[in-house]
Amino acid sequence: MAKGDIVLITFPFTNLSGSKLRPAVVLADTSLDVTVCFVTTQIGWQENTDVLLIPSSINGLRKQSLIRTSKIATLDRTLAMGLLGKLSKQDIDNLDKQLKILLQLP
């Protein structure tokens, strides 16, 4: 896995009451863990730092989706069930920009 990959992964609910298999964008990958942002098709709930994704053969998405930059998790890499696709260079640049805003980085 590499930064910008879109994977299917078991992602925990924010209240830790359960989890759901969902697409997520890889931010970082180590030998044991992967850090991801989850992806949702609930575009009506868009926040300022979310990144809109348009479905394409490259990213493997079927519907318009949002990268929820505020929903970041570091998970065991064995929870990743498969590769859906990859972000375009433009989408990666946009993701980086929005993460800087979210994390208040210069």
How would you name each of these model-derived features?
Residues 1-106:
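Conserved functional hotspots at enzyme active or ligand-binding sites that engage polyanionic ligands
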